[in-house]
Curated annotation (Swiss-Prot), chain A:
Organism, as annotated: Saccharomyces cerevisiae (strain ATCC 204508 / S288c) (Baker's yeast)
Sequence similarity: Belongs to the MDM34 family.
Entry comment, domain topic: Lacks alpha-helical transmembrane segments, suggesting that it resides in the membrane via beta-sheet conformations similar to those predicted for other outer membrane proteins and porin. The SMP-LTD domain is a barrel-like domain that can bind various types of glycerophospholipids in its interior and mediate their transfer between two adjacent bilayers.
Domain SMP-LTD residues, every copy: 1-190
Protein name per UniProt: Mitochondrial distribution and morphology protein 34
Chief site of localization: mitochondrion
Self-association and partners: Component of the ER-mitochondria encounter structure (ERMES) or MDM complex, composed of MMM1, MDM10, MDM12 and MDM34.
PANTHER family assigned to the protein according to its UniProt record, in alphabetical order: MITOCHONDRIAL DISTRIBUTION AND MORPHOLOGY PROTEIN 34
GO BP terms, alphabetized: mitochondrial genome maintenance; mitochondrion organization; mitochondrion-endoplasmic reticulum membrane tethering; phospholipid homeostasis; phospholipid transport
Topology with respect to the bilayer: Multi-pass membrane protein
Other remarks in the entry: Present with 377 molecules/cell in log phase SD medium.
Chain spans, region Disordered: 338-375
Alphabetized UniProt keyword annotations: Lipid transport, Lipid-binding, Membrane, Mitochondrion, Mitochondrion outer membrane, Transmembrane, Transmembrane beta strand, Transport, Ubl conjugation
Curated annotation (Swiss-Prot), chain B:
InterPro entries per the UniProt record, alphabetical: Mdm10
Entry keywords, A to Z: Membrane, Mitochondrion, Mitochondrion outer membrane, Transmembrane, Transmembrane beta strand
Entry's localization field: Mitochondrion outer membrane
Disulfide bonds, paired cysteine numbers: none
Topological relation to the membrane, as annotated: Multi-pass membrane protein
Function description: Component of the ERMES/MDM complex, which serves as a molecular tether to connect the endoplasmic reticulum and mitochondria. Components of this complex are involved in the control of mitochondrial shape and protein biogenesis and may function in phospholipid exchange. MDM10 is involved in the late assembly steps of the general translocase of the mitochondrial outer membrane (TOM complex). Functions in the TOM40-specific route of the assembly of outer membrane beta-barrel proteins, including the association of TOM40 with the receptor TOM22 and small TOM proteins.
Subunit structure: Component of the ER-mitochondria encounter structure (ERMES) or MDM complex, composed of MMM1, MDM10, MDM12 and MDM34. Associates with the mitochondrial outer membrane sorting assembly machinery SAM(core) complex, which consists of SAM35, SAM37 and SAM50, to form a SAM(holo) complex.
One Gene Ontology biological process: mitochondrial outer membrane translocase complex assembly
Name of the protein in its database record: Mitochondrial distribution and morphology protein 10
Main location (coarse class): mitochondrion
Length: 459, 493
């Protein structure tokens, strides 16, 4: 199956003109009940989509059900768009009220004339990112917007109303994406399916426009002739996918990439995907970090299945001070977010250990002894029975910068983190060091991937 | 024409001595009636009658696209209501229609009581007595109206609670639009101030209106001793609680008579501080048979302006004038009574309380025999000394009285009303008259469409030249078209 995305439609300015035309006719449609407050039609002054809207197909499924043609998940994004509309409103609300109520009960007001204000509303730098489910069926196209991220700057010529209008707009956006847009798209697509190939419009001005729609619609349904127009590269790819499936080989067809199709994951590449899930060692591996030969973490461990790999940082990473504490904390919180799929508001419980220096005179004697003392002190503070910190001594590191990171109760293998701090400065100031860990994570928690806030770095 | 029920309402106010000229709602009534008069928009027929002295019925038909109408009932326990109500054959035209409102300067009754005692006429005394009567009887009015086929209901209750207060309840219930509106008015009239508290269920509208009458003290600049002007200042405040829409306005009204001709003139200036509207009106009764009004609107914020003109031309019954005068008692018994009573009452009312009622004083002096001779002489000397100014007062009063008498006594057969507005480009035309016991009003509203068609032709200029000439000729033929046309018949017994 192939698609043709006609970029030329968006290339020139005619696209913006078309949107402006459609928008102004839709806003001024006579079928809609005109509000009393509006004293003139709504005029769409300017529409500007400087960039081509991006459409990314995340998943596509051709179901063999009788009527449905295709089902897919798409990511639509649109950037830096601009829209300006202008109208005239009645500011005297009492006058509107006076006109609504019968004159018998309405007390007559003196000098209660109409006072109209022209109002211009500008929506600038509109950024839309939405993940949609698309169902192409025979009568029409159904779209549901799942994860909509819309942001725009709003500017109103009447400054008093700006905050109110903005608040109401943001409230109503929910309805627009949930209700208005899907029904609109469905209705227009129904036209495409039913009136295919015939231009039944009566308005001469719109005939050309309508014709464009019908020619576009031809590409929606596959005909036998369409197969001839498919690109050879796509056909080659498709055939390779098919062949890889038919061989039942567990090795992927392409060695260096996760998937043949960008954005799609195949079963035989799952372990790679899992191996790049954000755990501490994976995160490390995703960086192009030159692995030293003498590393305790072998490269073999990276491709190990998830259930046997441990969520730990190699010692070399810590030694070379590639990570600071903030990065580790970030990874940990992301891990927590993934595993904790049920409630979003749960915050990771962190165990903070303050390592305040309570130096006894004996501690000042030698560096090595001090290190041992510190680590044991930590152990006594975090007195969880499962946790088995194995402190390792390192001669080079300053005394109270050696600490352990415990992430999971089960998988904890404590590592030392050597932070790249000036030891002299710290000793002089006696700055307390905060120990941050994450605990009580159940490994059996269901992991979820795809379509989350931060998709896995498998590109 | 005033609808029959409005005439009954007016009679109710008259019989219960409730003055309508003090209401802030009616502060611009003169210019409103001269500029924004209502034009019937269909063929309309109203038949009304007074079934008993206290009940009134009215039946309305109107045909626009289909026949619809209404049925209204009114009951009031006010006494002497029949004295103020007349059927359509007897009612003078100037009472049956809304026209220039002649105001009577408000007198402070507590101050003026000493003067009015000596007055030979008793009408003011009666009014005063009724107002301060301890045996004030609570009067009320009940009104209901049903429209068909839409089956909407209108209801109104007016209750006079005390000599100074009045309560009014108006309600509309529409079955089709599921619209129910109730509006309450509480009015308190202390002659110098009229305060109104209003609450309406539509939009939970709350309102307060106040009108203050400044006492007409003789000013230093006033060369005229006979003070007949009145100055009123009013304001209103509104707040719709649901939509939080505020509204307010303030208005100044000055009413006086021209000293030379005795003709009344009204000036108003109103200002809406929220929306910046300023509107000033000047209305004058230029003669017994003509009235003019000009109104200028201006908006402070948008610099929009509008100029409106309105005028009335009354037509008298020219022939048979002599016979009418002879048979005046027969034809117009109540108007004759009005002619007798009203000028005198007006005279005493117009007279300022600070100026002693010289007319009566002069009359009283010869009749009072117990005054000693030297005092009589002193009085005569005083009268002689101030005779020039007294004569001036008398002259002024007589001119005003003469003019009022002239208007009240003349029998008008019809009136033409015209009004136009420069911005809206409309011309309203209304004819009202009496014909065989029917009160007829017929009118139309013309809209000038020249500007609109010119813009159309400008658009068509791009297409071809032939259409331009075609539209031009059309423009020449029909620059206006009627937006409204209607005729209304009223008959009441």
């Amino acid at each position: 199956m192939s698609f043709r995305f006609n970029e030329a439609v968006f290339g020139d300015n005619s696209f913006n003109e078309r949107i402006r035309e459609k928008l102004s006719t839709a806003l001024n449609s006579p079928s809609k009940k005109k509000l009393d407050i509006l004293k003139s039609g709504i005029k769409v002054q300017k529409v500007d989509f400087p960039t081509i809207p991006q459409l990314e197909i995340l998943d596509l499924d051709i179901i063999t059900q009788p009527k449905s043609l295709a089902k897919g998940i798409c990511k639509i994004s649109c950037k830096d768009a601009m829209l300006r509309i202008q109208t005239v409103i009645e500011s005297n609300l009492l006058l509107i009220n006076e006109q609504d109520t019968p004159s018998f009960t309405m007390p007559q007001l003196i000098n209660n004339g109409s006072f109209t204000i022209p109002i211009t509303m500008t929506f600038s730098s509109i950024e839309l990112e939405a993940i949609t489910n698309i169902f192409v069926k025979n009568p029409g196209i159904g779209i549901s917007f799942n994860d909509v991220d819309l942001d725009f700057k709003f500017d109103c010529s009447v400054k008093i109303l700006q905050s109110t209008i903005e608040r109401r707009l943001k409230e109503s956006m929910h309805v627009v994406f949930k209700d208005v847009l899907p029904s609109l798209i469905f209705n227009t697509s129904q036209n495409w399916f039913t009136n295919r190939g015939e231009s039944t419009s009566t308005i001469p001005g719109k005939r050309e426009h309508h014709h464009q729609q019908t020619t576009m619609s031809r590409n929606v349904i596959l005909d036998g002739s369409d197969f001839q127009e498919l690109s050879p590269i796509n056909m080659l790819r498709l055939s390779s996918i098919v062949s890889s499936r038919s061989t039942l080989s567990l090795h992927s067809t392409v060695m260096n990439s996760l998937s043949a199709i960008p954005g799609c994951l195949e079963r035989q590449n799952l372990y790679r995907f899992i191996s790049r899930m954000p755990s501490l060692n994976n995160y490390y591996s995703s960086q192009s970090f030159p692995q030293p030969k003498s590393s305790t973490v072998s490269s073999k461990q990276l491709v190990k299945p998830f259930y046997c790999s441990h969520n730990l940082l190699p010692k070399t990473v810590l030694d070379s001070s590639q990570y600071d504490l903030a990065t580790i904390t970030k990874i940990q919180s992301r891990l927590f977010d993934r595993s904790n799929s049920n409630d979003d508001n749960a915050k990771p419980r962190r165990r903070k250990i303050k390592c305040k220096k309570t130096r006894t005179p004996s501690n000042l004697q030698s560096q090595g002894e001090q290190a041992v003392d510190d680590s044991t002190a930590i152990e006594t503070v975090t007195s969880t029975p499962v946790q088995t910190p194995i402190p390792e001594l390192e001669e080079q590191s300053p005394p109270y910068l050696k600490t352990t990171v415990s992430i999971r109760d089960k998988y904890v293998i404590p590592e030392k983190i050597s932070l790249n701090l000036d030891s002299k400065k710290d000793t002089s100031k006696k700055k307390p060091f905060y120990f941050i860990g994450l605990n009580s994570q159940e490994p059996s928690n269901n992991w979820k991937w795809g379509m989350e806030d931060s998709p896995p770095p498998y590109h | 024409m005033l609808p029959y029920m409005d005439q009954v309402l007016r009679a109710f106010y008259q019989s219960t001595h409730w003055s309508t000229q003090n209401s802030y709602e009616d502060i611009t009534a003169t210019s409103r009636t001269l500029l924004d008069f209502r034009i019937p928009s269909a063929i309309h027929l109203q038949i009304s009658n007074k079934s008993t002295p206290n009940t009134f019925n009215s039946l309305d038909f109107s045909t626009r696209s289909r026949i619809n109408g209404s049925l209204s009932y009114l009951y009031s326990d006010a006494q002497q209501l029949e004295k103020f109500m007349r059927n359509s054959t007897d009612i003078p035209l100037q009472d049956a229609t809304e026209t220039y409102r002649q105001l009577q300067p408000n007198l402070n009754y507590s101050v003026s009581s000493g003067n009015t005692l000596s007055s030979d006429n008793t009408t003011v005394d009666n009014d005063k007595k009724l107002l301060h009567d301890s045996k004030f009887v609570k009067k009320s009015l009940y009104y209901g109206r049903m429209y068909y086929p839409s089956s909407d209901l209108e209801a109104m209750i007016i209750k006079r609670l005390s000599p100074q207060t009045q309560f009014m309840l108006k309600g509309v219930s529409s079955f089709k639009e599921s619209l129910n509106v109730l509006t309450c008015y509480f009015q308190r009239d202390s002659h110098r101030n009229l305060q109104e508290w209003i609450f309406s269920t539509s939009d939970l509208l709350c309102g307060y209106r106040v009108l203050h009458n400044f006492l007409t003290t003789p000013s230093k600049f006033n060369t005229s001793l006979y003070n007949n002007s009145s100055l009123s200042l009013g304001a209103e405040f509104w707040l719709g609680l649901v939509s939080l829409s505020p509204g307010c306005s303030t208005t100044l009204r000055y009413y006086t008579h021209s000293t030379n001709t005795g003709r009344p003139l009204t000036l108003t200036l109103s200002w809406n501080p929220l929306f910046g509207h300023i509107s000033s009106t000047y209305s004058a009764k230029t003669g017994t048979n003509s009235t003019f009004c000009a109104k200028y609107d201006f908006n402070l914020y948008s610099i929009e302006s509008n100029l409106s003109f309105g005028c009335e031309f009354w037509q008298k019954k020219h022939h048979l004038l002599e016979t009418n005068k002879n048979n005046n008692d027969k034809l117009e018994p109540i108007s004759d009574e009005l002619v007798d009573i009203n000028p005198n009452s007006r005279a005493t009312k117009l007279l300022h309380e600070n100026v002693p009622d010289l007319n009566s004083a002069v009359n009283d002096i010869p009749s009072t025999l117990d005054i000693p001779v030297h005092k009589q002489k002193l009085l005569n000397d005083l009268t002689y000394a101030f005779s020039s100014s007294l004569r001036k007062i008398d002259e002024e009063r007589s001119t005003i009285e003469k003019f009022d008498n002239k208007i009240n006594s003349s029998i008008f057969t019809s009136v033409w009303k015209l009004s136009t507005s420069l911005r809206d480009k409309t011309l309203k035309l209304l004819w009202e008259g009496k014909w065989r016991g029917f009160l007829i009003s017929a009118g139309t509203e013309l809209v000038f469409t020249r500007g609109f068609q010119e813009s159309l032709s400008d658009d068509e200029k791009n297409d071809n030249a032939i259409s331009i000439s075609a539209t031009d000729t059309e423009n020449g033929n029909i620059p206006v078209f009627p937006a409204k046309f209607g005729i209304q018949f009223q008959y009441s017994t």
